């Protein structure tokens, strides 16, 4: 399991590479946020229910429906209009999800060569986009109504992108450069 790998191998390795004197200085993954945006299709309750069901299967916990905060006439949406769902994973569920992401989902993704340094936000967090949520084995292909995308945000307590990249490389996430 990745949590045991982190404690036994990754922490000592990063402590040596980054030159930290204290184990608590070593960066760690704080949480993983998953988001499925439906846009205008969110008004269809059938699509919204399938989105919530699929994200619950992927994450292993019940997602929260997200809605529009302000009305925007150009997009033809009103305040309170459902547009997607999200879920935040921490601790054991987070490590279980990351294990499935690294070893199952990313290798199954079409045209995936690796993650780019440009996907970091400057504070040590990375955002990954999955084009088809059917890459996850938990989702039954016969029961889905529409193939949707999935946004994955991995939040770390690293102070910069370099430290976060080293941490994620130790976990086994592939990087292009």
Curated annotation (Swiss-Prot):
The keyword Isomerase does not apply. One of its GO terms (cellular component) is ribosome. Keywords: Ribonucleoprotein, Ribosomal protein, RNA-binding, rRNA-binding, tRNA-binding. The keyword rRNA-binding applies. GO terms for biological process: translation. One of its GO terms (molecular function) is tRNA binding. It comes from the Bacteria. HAMAP family: Ribosomal_uL5_B. This is one of the proteins that bind and probably mediate the attachment of the 5S RNA into the large ribosomal subunit, where it forms part of the central protuberance. In the 70S ribosome it contacts protein S13 of the 30S subunit (bridge B1b), connecting the 2 subunits; this bridge is implicated in subunit movement. Contacts the P site tRNA; the 5S rRNA and some of its associated proteins might help stabilize positioning of ribosome-bound tRNAs. Belongs to the universal ribosomal protein uL5 family. Part of the 50S ribosomal subunit; part of the 5S rRNA/L5/L18/L25 subcomplex. Contacts the 5S rRNA and the P site tRNA. Forms a bridge to the 30S subunit in the 70S ribosome. This is Large ribosomal subunit protein uL5. The lineage of its organism: Bacteria, Pseudomonadati, Pseudomonadota, Alphaproteobacteria, Rickettsiales. The gene is rplE.
